[in-house]
């Protein structure tokens, strides 16, 4: 039985798709005004794992991840760069795809852009106005009136906003003036800003209405999972629920799923705070597997803190897994009776518990190392299991030899020195002078080399 934590209910609930053989997922995507940082990566990596795991379990998936390609941030940056907003967003979308490809993240089934759904957005706004859930402010903006939605605050558990607005209504505040907590559905454009024609004048959509209209258009008003980072719970997802439910009372999402924040020195990592680490910078400094391990070694709902120490620990952990695959045939198709797969499934069925899943992977790794010389066939069988399960989490996609060796990074003189020490160690081993042999191994470790003794001889690779 699979359970997923539902933010709306604040508890884990049994997951059963609305349609028995397909899982429909909508995730709020990026606003392409700058390069993606590892805060974005955490959400994107997690939902990639979710989709891969559903597919592993035999479900078909329909994964929608929107792109907010019109936004104040895009307009402001384009203005300062003296270029058209759409050229900026197009360029950043290409850069996003480059980063996600470097992390081996699958593309969604559909990646709708807001600017391609203006008509759907206008239609939903018209309905909200007709049903008296929205009003036109003195500035001409179309604004959603949250006091008209009785369950406002249910997702975020922030009910004070609703209470405040009800008091405002009781005290007969002028509704032509936008109230503090109400949010814009359609924003009137300023001169020289990008805009679209509407019944209320030229303007552009507000942030929250975009996802409501696009999810309704692509998945309908009832679907399985809506997700994003935990910073979207309020106000974005709270507002989405309000406007979607008011536009169509049948609207329902079974599970609201949110990832925890990536922290940097006790602050949320974000571009606006100037403390973000770009995906491409981290991949270049470490590698994709190390970054993905760091992002998934803690439970997806918890906060994680980026630090050099945590990245080095992640790098070391990934290398341990690759070392166990080293000198094995992980494409070995002979079936094996093993307990690890069921334990891995139990972990993932428990709200995608990747830390527990990793403990299973490391158990397999230890078994592979144990059987490498004693029973190579069993080691090969277990390597196949490790490779297949790791690929669900999205790691161990590289060839172990090429990942571990990187011998080209050593100079020719250093490689000769390494080979000389290995030869000396082998001579000590033949003479059964184990302490001296161990001293030679320590010398290699000191210069950044790890050894593996196999039936074929001693292999070395870079730490």
Swiss-Prot record:
Q: According to the UniProt entry, where does the motif 'HIGH' region sit in this chain? A: 30-40
Q: Which catalysed reactions does the entry list for this protein?
A: tRNA(Cys) + L-cysteine + ATP = L-cysteinyl-tRNA(Cys) + AMP + diphosphate
According to its UniProt record, the EC number is 6.1.1.16
Q: What is this protein called?
A: Cysteine--tRNA ligase
Q: Does the keyword Zinc apply?
A: yes
Q: Which enzyme class?
A: ligase
Which amino acid positions bind ATP, per UniProt? Answer: 271
Reported cofactor(s): Zn(2+)
Q: According to its UniProt record, where is this protein located? A: Cytoplasm
Which coarse location class describes where this protein primarily resides? cytoplasm
Might you report a single GO cellular component term? cytosol
User: Which InterPro entries does this entry report, sorted A to Z?
Assistant: Cys-tRNA-ligase, Cys-tRNA-synt_Ia_DALR, Cys-tRNA/MSH_ligase, Rossmann-like_a/b/a_fold, tRNA-synt_1_cat_dom, tRNAsynth_Ia_anticodon-bd
């Amino acid at each position: 039985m699979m359970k997923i934590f539902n933010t709306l209910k604040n508890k884990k609930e049994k997951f059963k798709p609305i349609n028995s053989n397909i899982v429909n997922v909508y995730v709020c995507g990026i606003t392409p005004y700058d390069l993606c940082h590892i805060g974005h990566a955490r959400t994107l990596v997690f939902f990639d794992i979710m989709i891969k795991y559903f597919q592993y379990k035999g479900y078909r998936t329909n994964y929608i991840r929107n792109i907010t390609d019109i936004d104040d941030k895009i307009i402001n940056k384009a203005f300062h760069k003296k270029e058209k907003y759409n050229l900026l967003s197009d360029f950043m979308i290409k850069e996003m795809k480059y980063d996600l490809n470097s992390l081996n993240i699958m593309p969604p089934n559909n990646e709708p852009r807001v600017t391609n759904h203006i008509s759907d957005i206008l239609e939903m706004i018209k309905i909200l106005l007709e049903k008296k859930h929205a009003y036109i402010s003195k500035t001409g903006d179309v604004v959603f009136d949250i006091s008209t939605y009785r369950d406002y605050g249910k997702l975020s558990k922030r009910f004070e906003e609703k209470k405040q607005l009800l008091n405002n209504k009781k005290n007969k505040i002028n509704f032509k003036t936008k109230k503090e907590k109400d949010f814009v559905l359609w924003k009137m454009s300023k001169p020289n800003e990008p805009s679209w024609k509407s019944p209320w004048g030229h303007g552009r959509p507000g942030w929250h209405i975009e996802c409501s209209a696009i999810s309704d258009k692509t998945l309908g008003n009832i679907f399985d999972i809506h997700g994003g980072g935990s910073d979207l719970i309020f106000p974005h997802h709270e507002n989405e629920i309000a406007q979607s439910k008011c536009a169509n009372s049948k609207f329902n999402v079974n599970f609201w799923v949110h990832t925890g924040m990536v922290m940097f020195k006790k602050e949320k990592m974000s571009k606006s705070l100037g403390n973000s680490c770009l995906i491409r910078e981290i991949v270049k400094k470490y590698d994709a597997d190390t970054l993905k391990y760091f992002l998934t070694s803690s439970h997806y709902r918890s906060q994680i803190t980026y630090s050099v120490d945590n990245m080095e620990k992640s790098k070391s952990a990934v290398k341990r897994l690759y070392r166990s695959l080293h000198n094995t045939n992980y494409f070995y198709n002979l079936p094996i009776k093993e307990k690890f797969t069921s334990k891995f499934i139990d972990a993932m069925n428990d709200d995608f518990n990747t830390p527990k899943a990793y403990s299973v992977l490391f158990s397999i790794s230890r078994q592979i190392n144990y059987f490498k010389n004693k029973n190579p066939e069993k080691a090969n069988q277990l390597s196949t299991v490790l490779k297949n399960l790791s690929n669900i989490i999205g790691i161990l996609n590289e060839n172990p030899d090429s990942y571990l060796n990187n011998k080209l990074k050593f100079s020719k003189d250093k490689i000769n020195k390494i080979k000389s020490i290995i030869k000396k160690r082998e001579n000590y081993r033949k003479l059964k002078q184990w302490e001296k042999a161990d001293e030679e191994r320590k010398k290699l470790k000191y210069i950044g080399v790890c050894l593996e003794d196999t039936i074929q001889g001693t292999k070395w690779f870079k730490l």
